[in-house]
Amino acid sequence: DLFWATVGGMGLTGIIVSVTLKLRRIETAYIRVQYHRTRNLDETMRLLEEEDQDYNYSVAWVDGQAVGGSLGRSVLIRGNHATVDDLSPQQATQPLEFAHRRTWTVPPQVPNFVLDRFSVRAFNSLYYRRFRQHPVNSIIDYDRFFYPLDSLREWNRLYGKRGFIQYQCVFPPDTSRAALVEVLSRLSKGKIPLCLVVLKRFGAETGLLSFPMPGYTLALDMPMLGTPLLSVLHELDQWVIRQGGRVYLAKDACLSAEAFKEMYPRFGQWQRMKTEMDPQNLFSSDLSRRLQITGVDD
């Protein structure tokens, strides 16, 4: 129906003028966090599958430059909402408030070499070794937990004038491991600096154009290296299709219309709903025209 065509529908069914949300009741503005360093992708996936149900939030920071037996080594970052009893005496006096963190601003005109393969490899190694092999627990405020990059204002300037590309894909459970190994290996062989790599598990899909499906999603941030990078990403698109996965439209910048239709099998059902509700295609976007969702891009 219209609801499920709109959820995940990229704003193409119209303007949402009213939303009712069901919220989770919490006692504090803090998160009880566990950091756990893993040796490789197999250990990362095993812990996510065995222990995800114990946490409200779960994500893995992946060292995208690691290769060989260390491929996919990660830092698991998992958290639950803290109760008042979890807080220090000082925090417990005002459990729904916290001290705002100090921020730094990246200056303009950062040289492109600041984020190359060598600097990214060095940073990843230092960040990975910052954590111990056994789990470490901590209490942090929700702002630091959910928005870790916000300490660095204008962080996108680190990529220089070339900018950056975000690529996120999802794979079903039966193909996830092999698919993740292929993606990480192919990008590493292509000498592409993977500046930020995040791995999560997904539940069931809902909307007709929803990105999630049961399985694993991998999100990657990379410097925009022009044609060489785009060629690799187009190859990855075909790999994603063969593994039964799809690419996240909200972050997409280079998917083809043909690949999109293969990745989203419920597109025809969504399109019929769109035609019924908006026969003149009044609601469209650069993305929808490029992917020929609402017409052909000029």
Regions found by a protein language model. Give the residues of each.
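Noncatalytic alpha-helical scaffold of FAD-dependent oxidoreductases
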Residues: 1-298
